[in-house]
Design a protein with these regions (language model features):
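Short amphipathic alpha-helix that is part of the acyltransferase structural core
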Residues: 23-65
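Replication-associated primase and helicase/ATPase modules
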Residues: 1-19
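Short hydrophobic/aromatic beta-strand or adjacent loop that forms the aromatic wall/cage
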Residues: 69, 210-215
């Protein structure tokens, strides 16, 4: 999933961790200039087009997720005349691409631009809005393939449910990675045998991720009960 990232390396994830684990209500001074305080940011929902642009520009996947139910974003102040300034971070919440026995909503993209903004503040505001909309259990996955460990979720007091085993997440077709959902959309299947029959002159190999760290947050007692039924553990 996509997760906290300007680019997809571990160093950036660590830098993001430094940013978000600082105080979000006051400027957190860093050697390179510090983070923008949450008090100077505006939280908004529904700014999907602008948020999609951020994903295409800054997120390592360069792909907008499917089945999006809500987009939350942070904006700089609009200045003297009020209103919103530029978007500086966005979070996409979707119906999960993997099947769950009960309804949950998944954080499928978390992205920031060049400005150092407190992503924990964005996740927290999104959680409040999702609870208002009736959701009771949030999940997200930090992709080890991209060097992500889930520092934002830890700093946001989410529960850690362990690391999922390596899984087939798509195909490599003539050297280019295609996620499983993209294969289904483009070709009507993600079966390697069927794809090889469809494209006999292409090189097609399965792609496996390195496993994903699972994090979750219950929004009330109903969500806690659902998490227990789903076998989600507390800080495995």
């Amino acid at each position: 999933t996509g997760y906290v990232s300007k680019v997809g390396d571990g160093e950036t994830a660590m830098n993001n961790a430094t940013i978000v684990e600082g105080r979000t209500t006051a400027r957190h001074h860093l050697a390179d200039g510090g983070a923008i305080p949450a008090s100077s940011l505006h939280f908004r929902t529904g700014r999907r087009q602008e948020a999609e642009g951020m994903v295409l520009t800054y997120h390592y996947s360069k792909r907008v997720p499917s089945n999006v139910q809500m987009v939350g974003s942070l904006h700089l102040d609009g200045g003297l005349f009020g209103g919103d300034g530029p978007m500086v971070a966005a979070a996409f919440w979707s119906i999960p691409p993997t099947r769950w026995a009960e309804p949950v909503i998944e954080l499928t993209r978390l992205v920031r631009g060049d400005d150092r903004v407190p992503l924990t503040f964005l996740v927290s505001r999104c959680a409040k809005e999702l609870k208002r909309q009736g959701y009771d259990l949030l999940v997200s996955f930090a992709d080890r393939t991209q060097g992500h460990e889930g520092y934002v979720y830890r700093a946001s007091n989410w529960n850690y449910a362990g690391c999922r085993e390596r899984a087939n997440d798509g195909m490599v077709i003539d050297g280019a990675f295609h996620p499983g959902r993209t294969c289904n959309s483009l070709f009507g299947t993600r079966s390697i045998d069927k794809l090889r029959q469809m494209f006999p002159h292409k090189t097609i190999e399965p792609h496996y991720d390195e496993g994903k760290h699972c994090y979750w947050l219950a929004l009330g007692k109903r969500g806690e009960a659902k998490a227990a039924r789903l076998g989600l553990t507390h800080n495995a």
